C-alpha cells in the first residue's frame, strides 16, 4: 500500500471555514446574494465572484444610510422604535434617496408641503 494517502489527518492543521462575507468585511450574505444573482441571469448562471461582493457592499451601505436617517428621525420625535413613518421621512427628506427609492411605503403617510404661492406675506391680511 505504498504511495497512498497517509490517512485522514496527514499532518495538516484543519483550518476553520471563513465565509466570503467575513473575507470582504461585510454583514450582508455574499453567498446568498451570489446564489440569487445566478438564479436571475439568462446566461446559464454565469456571475463573477466579485459581482456578489460588490452587490452586497452596495446593499449594506444603502441599508445603513436609510437606517441612520430613520434613526435620526425617530430621535427627533423622541421615540425609540423606527416605524414606517420614520423611514418615509428619512427617504423623502434626502434628495438622492428620494430619487433612488420611488416606491410607496405602506404606513408611511405623506410629507407635509405647502406651496410658496399659497403662503401669504406677513404684512397682508385677508379682507372680508
From Swiss-Prot:
<comment type="similarity">
    <text>Belongs to the histone H2A family.</text>
</comment>
<feature type="modified residue" description="N6-acetyllysine; alternate">
    <location>
        <position position="8"/>
    </location>
</feature>
<feature type="cross-link" description="Glycyl lysine isopeptide (Lys-Gly) (interchain with G-Cter in ubiquitin)">
    <location>
        <position position="122"/>
    </location>
</feature>
<dbReference type="InterPro" id="IPR032454">
    <property type="entry name" value="Histone_H2A_C"/>
</dbReference>
<feature type="modified residue" description="N6-acetyllysine; alternate">
    <location>
        <position position="12"/>
    </location>
</feature>
<dbReference type="GO" id="GO:0031490">
    <property type="term" value="F:chromatin DNA binding"/>
</dbReference>
<dbReference type="GO" id="GO:0005634">
    <property type="term" value="C:nucleus"/>
</dbReference>
<dbReference type="GO" id="GO:0030527">
    <property type="term" value="F:structural constituent of chromatin"/>
</dbReference>
<dbReference type="InterPro" id="IPR009072">
    <property type="entry name" value="Histone-fold"/>
</dbReference>
<dbReference type="GO" id="GO:0000792">
    <property type="term" value="C:heterochromatin"/>
</dbReference>
<comment type="function">
    <text>Variant histone H2A which replaces conventional H2A in a subset of nucleosomes. Nucleosomes wrap and compact DNA into chromatin, limiting DNA accessibility to the cellular machineries which require DNA as a template. Histones thereby play a central role in transcription regulation, DNA repair, DNA replication and chromosomal stability. DNA accessibility is regulated via a complex set of post-translational modifications of histones, also called histone code, and nucleosome remodeling. May be involved in the formation of constitutive heterochromatin.</text>
</comment>
<keyword id="KW-0544">Nucleosome core</keyword>
<keyword id="KW-0488">Methylation</keyword>
<feature type="region of interest" description="M6 cassette">
    <location>
        <begin position="89"/>
        <end position="100"/>
    </location>
</feature>
<feature type="region of interest" description="Required for interaction with INCENP">
    <location>
        <begin position="1"/>
        <end position="17"/>
    </location>
</feature>
<feature type="compositionally biased region" description="Basic and acidic residues">
    <location>
        <begin position="1"/>
        <end position="12"/>
    </location>
</feature>
<feature type="modified residue" description="N6-methyllysine; alternate">
    <location>
        <position position="8"/>
    </location>
</feature>
<keyword id="KW-0539">Nucleus</keyword>
<dbReference type="GO" id="GO:0031507">
    <property type="term" value="P:heterochromatin formation"/>
</dbReference>
<dbReference type="GO" id="GO:0046982">
    <property type="term" value="F:protein heterodimerization activity"/>
</dbReference>
<keyword id="KW-0007">Acetylation</keyword>
<feature type="modified residue" description="N6-lactoyllysine; alternate">
    <location>
        <position position="12"/>
    </location>
</feature>
<dbReference type="GO" id="GO:0000786">
    <property type="term" value="C:nucleosome"/>
</dbReference>
<keyword id="KW-0158">Chromosome</keyword>
<dbReference type="InterPro" id="IPR002119">
    <property type="entry name" value="Histone_H2A"/>
</dbReference>
<feature type="modified residue" description="N6-lactoyllysine; alternate">
    <location>
        <position position="14"/>
    </location>
</feature>
<feature type="modified residue" description="N6-acetyllysine; alternate">
    <location>
        <position position="14"/>
    </location>
</feature>
<dbReference type="GO" id="GO:0000791">
    <property type="term" value="C:euchromatin"/>
</dbReference>
<dbReference type="GO" id="GO:0031492">
    <property type="term" value="F:nucleosomal DNA binding"/>
</dbReference>
<dbReference type="GO" id="GO:0045944">
    <property type="term" value="P:positive regulation of transcription by RNA polymerase II"/>
</dbReference>
<dbReference type="GO" id="GO:0006325">
    <property type="term" value="P:chromatin organization"/>
</dbReference>
<dbReference type="Pfam" id="PF16211">
    <property type="entry name" value="Histone_H2A_C"/>
</dbReference>
<protein>
    <recommendedName>
        <fullName>Histone H2A.Z</fullName>
    </recommendedName>
</protein>
<dbReference type="GO" id="GO:0000979">
    <property type="term" value="F:RNA polymerase II core promoter sequence-specific DNA binding"/>
</dbReference>
<keyword id="KW-0832">Ubl conjugation</keyword>
<dbReference type="InterPro" id="IPR007125">
    <property type="entry name" value="Histone_H2A/H2B/H3"/>
</dbReference>
<dbReference type="InterPro" id="IPR032458">
    <property type="entry name" value="Histone_H2A_CS"/>
</dbReference>
<feature type="region of interest" description="Required for interaction with PWWP2A">
    <location>
        <begin position="120"/>
        <end position="128"/>
    </location>
</feature>
<keyword id="KW-0238">DNA-binding</keyword>
<keyword id="KW-1017">Isopeptide bond</keyword>
<dbReference type="GO" id="GO:0070062">
    <property type="term" value="C:extracellular exosome"/>
</dbReference>
<feature type="region of interest" description="Required for interaction with INCENP">
    <location>
        <begin position="93"/>
        <end position="103"/>
    </location>
</feature>
Amino acid at each position: 500500500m505504498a504511495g497512498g494517502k497517509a490517512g485522514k489527518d496527514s499532518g495538516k492543521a484543519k483550518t476553520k471555514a471563513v465565509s466570503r462575507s467575513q473575507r470582504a468585511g461585510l454583514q450582508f450574505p455574499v453567498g446568498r446574494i451570489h446564489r440569487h444573482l445566478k438564479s436571475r441571469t439568462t446566461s446559464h448562471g454565469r456571475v463573477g465572484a466579485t459581482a456578489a461582493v460588490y452587490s452586497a457592499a452596495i446593499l449594506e451601505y444603502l441599508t445603513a444610510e436609510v437606517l441612520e436617517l430613520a434613526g435620526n428621525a425617530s430621535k427627533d420625535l423622541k421615540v425609540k422604535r423606527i416605524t414606517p413613518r420614520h423611514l418615509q421621512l428619512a427617504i423623502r427628506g434626502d434628495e438622492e434617496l428620494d430619487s433612488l427609492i420611488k416606491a410607496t411605503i405602506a404606513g408611511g403617510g405623506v410629507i407635509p408641503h405647502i406651496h410658496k404661492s399659497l403662503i401669504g406675506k406677513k404684512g397682508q391680511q385677508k379682507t372680508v
